[in-house]
């Protein structure tokens, strides 16, 4: 197996692997981060960093104060990024200070030393807009890529200055980005036991964070709430939706007004989606019919290994084996296709990671920016190999299984996918959505496929029945809000407002 093949295995369906700069990509091949005393984050160093964060209380949060009450678990501050264009409203542009922009750390209660970092941007339009949380995949990649390159309030330029994103999702929502699982982005821990290994741990941490968030921001408790994200978040999102729904049913803490969840180019049902690789690659003329037939023989082995992983309860050697066996399918396609960009097959892969997102890394590692965000001396981590490896046994789990109960209770699901993405392609997503067994399956399968219009032009194809909507987005790859920002914003708005629901077959338009 050559180095390129090995590298592609590591990157399969990661949401942000492509944004490592040349200087950071080296870390992927180095020894993974260890939390032992002799490793790169020794306990004493971590303690120094923790005490240095200006978002943190003056004493460690585990210390009980004189009145006997615990120091706050969630510590947040408003921020004003120093490199924002027209940051004071000159030239008629909105001022950063005109909107509520917050960054904070949350100390996870079921951990020894874990802090979860997040951004919160109040709506530019109406504070009564829904609250939307965005989760990036990986596993172990930071949500800041989506913030600065896809659907956040700002875009970042070559000179590390910021400008307003005309199609930021904060135009339609109060928007949260979380660095999770712990160890991702600006989130951190000094204890290896805080790393999560499955969706139970991940979803419980996020649920605890949301409880603390709404306690900090009670004015948003009654707003509608939606969970969104991309790629490996096809695992995170259904798990969190189920956790929130269960918490609401059991009357755990604050009721979260969950209305729906949206998965973009996600990995949700690996058994079905890996079976779509050969078909999609053939449709895109990346492989020949003979290649396709050979790959389908590999898929039979992959399918069996996933079933064995499921029989083991998502643990053990069977899951490790299924990860290796199934990823051979993708590796073989890339060996045949050559230098194609696996996030957008219309393009060639430039450099080892196909895209260059180094502007974000350079910006977030500026001292002035870290000071504004209150993250002390921590270096921004784009993707964590330690988190990735900790979650590896979770990879082949089927997260579709919890979705039918959510649909049955009226919680909406939007599955959308850019048509030119290979790695988490629209075909595989369409297949699992159509094959999912739920009360409306027959009607959904029979529903008409209709155009999705933006500016009176067809921007995608969609179908809907009841709480379920599927949308194939034209002229987009893996990252739909980056490739088609206007269509992505309109998609979000229409979906939250019920305008993507077209049971009568009418087209969805603004």
Curated annotation (Swiss-Prot):
Name of the protein this chain belongs to: Serine carboxypeptidase-like 48
Locate the active site.
231, 421, 478
Name the lineage. Eukaryota, Viridiplantae, Streptophyta, Embryophyta, Tracheophyta
Protein's GO biological process: proteolysis
Q: List the disulfide bonds.
A: 141-383, 309-326, 349-354
Q: Does the keyword Hydrolase apply?
A: yes
Instruction: Write out the similarity annotation.
Output: Belongs to the peptidase S10 family.
Native organism is Arabidopsis thaliana
Q: What task does this protein carry out?
A: Probable carboxypeptidase.
């Amino acid at each position: 197996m050559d180095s390129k093949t090995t590298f592609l295995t590591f990157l399969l369906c990661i949401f942000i692997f492509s944004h490592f700069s040349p200087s950071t990509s080296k870390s992927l091949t180095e020894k993974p981060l260890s939390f032992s005393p002799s490793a790169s984050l020794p306990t004493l160093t971590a303690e120094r960093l923790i005490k240095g964060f200006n978002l943190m209380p003056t004493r460690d949060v585990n210390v009980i104060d004189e009145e006997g009450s615990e120091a706050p678990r969630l510590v947040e501050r408003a921020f004003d990024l120093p490199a924002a264009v027209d940051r004071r409203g000159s030239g008629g542009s909105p001022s950063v200070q005109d909107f509520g922009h917050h960054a904070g750390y949350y100390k996870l209660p079921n951990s020894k030393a874990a802090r979860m970092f997040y951004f919160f941007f109040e709506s530019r339009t109406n504070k009564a807009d829904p609250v939307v949380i965005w989760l990036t995949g990986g596993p172990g990649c930071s949500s800041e890529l989506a913030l600065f390159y896809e659907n956040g309030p700002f875009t970042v330029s070559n000179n590390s200055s910021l400008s307003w994103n005309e199609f930021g999702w904060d135009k339609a929502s109060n928007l949260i980005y979380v660095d999770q699982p712990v160890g991702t982005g600006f989130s951190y821990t000094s204890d290896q036991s805080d790393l999560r290994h499955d969706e139970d741990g991940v979803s419980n941490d996020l649920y605890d964070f949301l409880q603390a968030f709404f306690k900090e921001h009670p004015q948003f408790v009654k707003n509608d709430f939606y969970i969104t994200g991309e790629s490996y978040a096809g695992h995170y999102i259904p798990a969190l939706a189920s956790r929130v729904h269960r918490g609401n049913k059991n009357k755990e803490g604050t009721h979260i007004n969950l209305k729906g969840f949206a998965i973009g180019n996600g990995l949700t049902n690996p058994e079905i989606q890996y079976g779509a690789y050969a078909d999609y690659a053939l449709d895109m003329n990346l492989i020949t019919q003979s290649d396709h037939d050979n790959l389908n023989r590999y898929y039979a082995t992959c399918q069996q290994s996933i079933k064995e992983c499921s029989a083991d309860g998502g643990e053990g050697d069977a899951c490790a084996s299924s990860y290796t066996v199934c990823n051979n399918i993708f590796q073989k396609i890339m060996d045949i296709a050559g230098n194609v960009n696996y996030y957008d097959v219309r393009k060639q892969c430039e450099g080892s990671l196909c895209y260059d997102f180094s502007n974000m890394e350079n910006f977030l590692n500026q001292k002035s920016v870290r000071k504004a965000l209150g993250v002390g001396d921590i270096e921004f981590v784009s993707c964590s190999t330690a988190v990735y490896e900790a979650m590896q046994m979770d990879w082949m789990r089927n997260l579709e299984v919890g979705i039918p109960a959510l649909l049955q209770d009226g919680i909406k699901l939007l599955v959308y996918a850019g048509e030119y993405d290979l790695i988490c392609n629209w075909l595989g997503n369409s297949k699992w959505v159509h094959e999912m067994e739920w009360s409306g399956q027959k009607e959904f399968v029979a529903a008409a496929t209709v155009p999705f219009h933006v500016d009176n032009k067809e921007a995608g194809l969609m179908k809907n029945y009841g709480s379920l909507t599927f949308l194939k987005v034209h002229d987009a790859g893996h990252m739909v809000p980056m490739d088609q920002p206007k269509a992505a914003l309109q998609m979000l708005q229409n979906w939250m407002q019920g305008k993507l629901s077209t049971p009568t077959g009418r087209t969805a338009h603004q």
